[in-house]
């Protein structure tokens, strides 16, 4: 009765794992697969001198590719954060490259530090929650399905991906975090087979 148009993710299986970058000045950084709405962090293992913390220079010293609208800022004297204006693109691999020589007395090999992260793809997973006999029609069923997404999605995006093989009166409820979407369909007629 209910037919979902699910997006299929093309998974690239790589035999070897990528080695994490190292810098004697870096304590932590964003890596792995993140939400499109998550800020990106670069955390140093020592403080940046106050006279070297010039917010206006951050755009020149730290680059993100592919280029993304947003803002780099000093969160404190050890942390740089990038917050996208709206969101990162779905299912995209990003690289951040920072010139550390403006903040630390680096050796030539440690002048630049770069790291990568990826964003979640648009995927749907549906679970049938319940099938009950309709109270007003013993030949009809009430069905409830939950649709889960790995990242926050707006209701219009999820609803546009779900199709029905028959005319149905569907009611949607979406969780505040945008990752759980519940659909209720009332009085689906029983099949004749």
Residue ranges and their predicted role:
Residues 11-193:
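Acidic, low-complexity Ser/Thr/Gly/Pro-rich repeat segments typical of extracellular/periplasmic
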Residues 1-7:
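Bacterial N-terminal signal peptides
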